[in-house]
């Protein structure tokens, strides 16, 4: 049987509805901020991403779906959306049209990574790009938009911000960082050693624990900003605070793409286990000119739809849990749990199991039936006129007296 490729999933039924719900919220919010829809190809020249994302980046170096087509063109499936929007902006001469242009997009992106929870080879993003607006107020507006989307979808996340400086302060900082890294090179991981010669700023993004300890003593970009960049970063914090947005300044936040300048930001959430980025972006004032257009300010963000779906589906499954599942570990106790179950049905939705199974099988059945409360009688419980009770939402459990069931469940 032919199946979907590894890391590329079908989206059906509830998943498809959830995807549409997220997109609808994102689109509605973007339109209220003055953004218009843009559709760009999923297949582009490889050179576009080598120049924009950076040849030394992991995306270009390891993760692109790159191939030569039948005409001999070096092409790849897009690994991210910003570069394609910038290419379209230049190709259609929007860089010469004057005025601020704002676009939003959504769709598939492709990276050849090891598939794991929250990370697929074909994944989906919603993104926005604003051109020709250099004010730090627009940086704040972009952050506020993503914050608003998160609130509308009831996703809890922490905002982290940083400034990467400009063409004046970044080279000076890069020199200081390079000196520090070379002094500690022998203690760094192999990826960090490679990045020292290709892109030393990306070393700050390393997640290896012993590298993080070494980097605690690294020079910070926020302490090496020139007067203009420092002033804008301070103003950004002032605007966010005035608009009720809490944040953390993270001087080691560099994002995974080479084109960012000045503002960089990321929203991270602990709702899917360890702290994971659910969306982020920043300013890229040099990218349009770097790709052949006229010098044009740029700022934007992208968010991971699958990450949002994982959080929301987990919440919805908890919200759907209702009622009681009652069972026995031995058939000689089924008469007892049957009577208890019938009594409970006067006040609750109750599923009674007539089969004697082991505890894990019963728990699996209760989970499949989306029960909120699991009740079970085994030998010890029967002797003590008790039931084992587990709350399948709170993940707590204890033994309760049969006479006190109603008090415990309410």
UniProtKB/Swiss-Prot annotation:
Its main location: cytoplasm. InterPro entries: aa-tRNA-synth_II, aa-tRNA-synth_II/BPL/LPL, Anticodon-bd, Anticodon-bd_dom_sf, His-tRNA-ligase, HisRS-like_core, HisRS/HisZ. HAMAP family: His_tRNA_synth. This is Histidine--tRNA ligase. It catalyses: tRNA(His) + L-histidine + ATP = L-histidyl-tRNA(His) + AMP + diphosphate + H(+). PROSITE patterns: AA_TRNA_LIGASE_II. One of its GO terms (molecular function) is ATP binding. Keywords: Aminoacyl-tRNA synthetase, ATP-binding, Cytoplasm, Ligase, Nucleotide-binding, Protein biosynthesis. One of its GO terms (biological process) is histidyl-tRNA aminoacylation. Disulfide bonds: none annotated. Belongs to the class-II aminoacyl-tRNA synthetase family. It comes from Campylobacter hominis (strain ATCC BAA-381 / DSM 21671 / CCUG 45161 / LMG 19568 / NCTC 13146 / CH001A). GO terms for cellular component: cytoplasm. The lineage of its organism: Bacteria, Pseudomonadati, Campylobacterota, Epsilonproteobacteria, Campylobacterales. It is found in: Cytoplasm.
């Amino acid at each position: 049987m032919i199946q979907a490729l590894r890391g590329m999933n079908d989206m059906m039924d509830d998943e498809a509805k959830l995807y549409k719900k997220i997109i609808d919220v994102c689109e509605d919010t973007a339109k209220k901020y003055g953004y218009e829809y843009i559709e760009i190809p999923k297949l582009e020249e490889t050179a576009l991403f080598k120049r924009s994302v950076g040849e030394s980046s992991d995306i270009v170096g390891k993760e692109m779906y790159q191939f030569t087509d039948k005409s001999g063109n070096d092409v790849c499936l897009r690994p991210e959306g910003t570069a394609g929007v910038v290419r379209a902006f230049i190709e259609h001469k929007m860089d010469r049209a004057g005025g601020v242009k704002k676009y939003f997009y959504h769709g598939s992106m492709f990276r050849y990574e090891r598939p794991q929870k929250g990370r697929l080879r074909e994944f989906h993003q919603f993104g926005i790009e604003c051109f020709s607006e250099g004010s730090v107020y627009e940086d704040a507006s972009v952050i506020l938009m993503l914050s608003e989307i998160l609130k509308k979808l009831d996703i809890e996340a922490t905002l982290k911000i940083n400034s990467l400086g400009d063409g004046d302060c970044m080279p000076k900082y890069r020199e200081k960082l390079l000196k520090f890294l070379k002094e500690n090179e022998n203690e760094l991981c192999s990826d960090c050693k490679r990045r020292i010669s290709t892109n030393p700023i990306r070393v700050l993004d390393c997640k290896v624990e012993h590298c993080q300890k070494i980097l605690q003593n690294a020079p910070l970009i926020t302490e090496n900003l020139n007067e203009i960049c420092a002033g804008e970063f301070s103003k950004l914090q002032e605007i966010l605070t005035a608009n009720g947005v809490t944040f953390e300044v993270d001087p080691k936040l560099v994002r995974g793409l080479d084109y960012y300048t000045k503002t960089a930001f990321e929203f991270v959430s602990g709702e899917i286990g360890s702290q994971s980025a659910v969306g982020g972006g920043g300013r890229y004032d040099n990218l349009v000119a770097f790709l052949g257009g006229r010098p044009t300010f740029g700022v934007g963000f992208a968010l991971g739809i699958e990450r949002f779906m994982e959080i929301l589906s987990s919440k919805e499954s908890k919200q759907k849990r209702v009622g009681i599942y009652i069972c026995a570990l031995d058939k000689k106790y089924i008469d007892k749990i049957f009577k208890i179950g019938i009594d409970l049905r006067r006040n609750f939705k109750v599923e009674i199991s007539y089969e004697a199974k082991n505890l894990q099988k019963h728990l699996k059945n209760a989970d499949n039936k989306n029960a909120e409360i699991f009740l079970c009688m085994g030998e010890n419980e029967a002797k003590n006129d008790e039931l084992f009770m587990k709350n399948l939402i709170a993940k707590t459990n204890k033994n309760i007296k049969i006479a006190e069931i109603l008090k415990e469940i309410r």
